[in-house]
Design a protein with these regions (language model features):
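N-terminal binding-site loop/beta-alpha segment at the start of enzyme catalytic domains
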Residues: 1-68
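Alpha-helical scaffolding within the catalytic cores
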Residues: 2-7, 53-59, 84-90, 138-140, ...
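Beta/alpha (TIM)-barrel catalytic core signal, keyed to glycine-rich beta->alpha loops juxtaposed to Asp/Glu
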Residues: 3, 28, 106-267
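Short, well-ordered coil/turn segments that N-cap beta-strands
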Residues: 14-19, 39-42, 66-70, 97-101, ...
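Active-site mouth loops of central-metabolism enzymes
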Residues: 16-28, 73-83, 196-204
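Acidic-and-aromatic substrate-binding clefts and catalytic sites of carbohydrate-active enzymes
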Residues: 24-30, 45-55, 77-84, 108-114, ...
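Alpha-helix-loop-beta-strand connector modules within alpha/beta enzyme cores
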Residues: 55-77, 122-127
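CE4/NodB-like, metal-dependent polysaccharide N-deacetylase domain
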Residues: 85-103, 122-126
Length: 267
């Protein structure tokens, strides 16, 4: 089975490893630095109180001259342009950066306000970020926003229990100028790893299987991993060498996903 290799993030031209790193769950700097040396170069700095590990990892790697190999994405949930800019710049300073590769407008299930987008595009024009992204749970919105031509990539929820993007988003984000696609919640907040939530007689999949599921879809450039510690980071890494799921394993993941979704409808 072929391993997952680095790829280009949509039309951005950025070279990315297939397994991305999310900051918010508390993993130490060592976990992120170890993953970087194994090809994980997409650093997603979202919300949460447990981001110190990634901040330190970014500082450490930049001090070693690795900045050009890193893709750093900073997300803001602010709905007002002035607040979005304030928090974005504060996050840059916290990591000792003059520029982020990507600014993400976070959790928009409706079109973000024109004023907010204009403020974000102004930051891009000033060189504080190179590309603009958007995240949200309304899958049908992404093709609409792509058609507007203002966003370079999207963060889209996708896992074995939430497969709607296969019909509502991915087929409509294609072509030479397609936006990059980064997926998140690969383990459905851990539910796809919980042996108590499995179909009767079905063992829980390995964490790496959840990341392999997402990365097996040809539309997906990067699948985010949010480790709480270095052990969880290491549990995810086999996905890179194992590569795409075979047909039998893919059907198993879908079967588990359908069961988890039908028995846990909260999300």
């Amino acid at each position: 089975m072929a391993a997952f290799k680095e790829r280009i993030l949509g039309a951005t031209g950025l070279t990315v490893g297939p397994l991305g790193l999310a900051a918010s769950y508390g993993a130490p700097a060592e976990a992120f630095e170890e993953a970087f040396e194994k090809g994980c170069n997409y650093f997603y700095f979202g919300s949460g109180r447990h981001r110190a590990g990634m901040k330190q990892a970014v500082r450490n790697l930049c001090a070693k001259g690795r900045r050009s190999r890193m893709v750093i994405a900073i997300q803001s949930y602010a709905r007002y342009g002035v607040l979005m800019e304030y928090f974005f710049k504060r996050n840059l300073r916290s990591m000792g950066l003059a520029q982020a590769d990507i600014l993400i407008l976070g959790w928009h299930n409706r079109r973000p306000s024109p004023k907010l987008v204009a403020r974000a595009l102004a930051l891009k024009e000033k060189g504080l970020c190179r590309f603009l992204g958007m995240s949200g749970h309304n899958r049908r919105l992404f093709p609409q926003m792509a058609a507007a031509g203002q966003f370079d990539l999207f963060h889209i929820r996708y896992n074995a229990a939430h497969r709607g993007a296969e019909e509502e988003a991915f087929p409509h984000l294609t072509g030479d100028s397609r936006p990059g696609i980064v997926t998140y919640t690969a383990t459905r907040w851990g539910q796809l790893l919980n042996s108590k939530k499995m179909p009767p007689g079905e063992p829980a999949p390995a964490p790496s299987d959840c990341y392999r599921f997402a990365l097996s879809h040809p539309a997906v450039d990067v699948c985010l991993c949010g480790p709480r510690n270095i052990d969880q980071m290491r549990e995810a890494m086999p996905a890179l060498e194992l590569g795409p799921l075979g047909q039998e394993d893919m059907e198993r993941m879908k079967r588990i996903g359908d069961y988890v979704h039908s028995h846990n409808r909260r999300f």
